[in-house]
Amino acid sequence: MPKVAYSEAEKAQVREALLTKGLELLAKQGIQHTTVEQIYKAVGISRTFFYSFFPTKESLIIEALYLQQPRVLVYAQKLMDAPSLSWREAVTQFLCACCYGEKNGILILTIEEQQMLFRRLSHEAYRTFREKQIRLFGNILECFGIGADCARVGLFTNISLMAMIVRRAIPETMPLFVPEAADETVAFQIKAIVDFLEPLKKENFCR
């Protein structure tokens, strides 16, 4: 018999479980191939109970992305602290893990997924997401030992997302790109990003 009443603590645990399982499935399968049913069944609750936490699939996705942000930052710091890795190796490994997010439990939205998700967000929800995104990428830069002014954060955000999204887009969304060269393209972009960041780290260190 299904449980009728949940305490507030139990509800909080269920909500956390939905986000954790949702993030896991979304990162592995993508937004379009992950259903609400898969998530609530994995947690062991009903469809109705799921919607008492998240009124739409999109609202769960946004919350899952927010859950992911501090985890990504912890991962970046772990690489920075690894004595076996040089600065370049740590940054390269971090960016590579993000570009191949589905293999590393990191949710990266494709172009189509971004369009589908954000056209359904309110202006306020979109503004909040952008603020959190800017804060995340600024924190990542600071984790790398680089000063995070607005212009620098904006550029780092764009060039990082460009590498991640292009990798996900070949060949389905970008059919004119050569799929056999996709990995080499990602490696080239990551090296270019690291080459751009390294002098900024030295500049920040000398101040």
Where in the sequence are the language-model features?
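C-terminal peripheral helix-coil segments that are non-catalytic and often amphipathic
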Residues: 1, 135-146, 162-207
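Basic, helix-initiating cap at the start of DNA-binding domains
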Residues: 1-29, 38
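An amphipathic alpha-helix adjacent to DNA-recognition modules
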Residues: 12-20, 32-33, 53-77, 92
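Hydrophobic/aromatic residues within well-ordered alpha-helical segments
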Residues: 14, 57, 64, 68, ...
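Helix-turn-helix
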Residues: 25-59, 63
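Hydrophobic alpha-helical connector segments
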Residues: 63, 77-104, 157
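Amphipathic alpha-helical packing segments from all-alpha helical-bundle domains
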Residues: 70-77, 119-147, 151-155, 180, ...
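Amphipathic alpha-helical segments used for helix-helix packing
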Residues: 89, 99-124, 138, 167-176
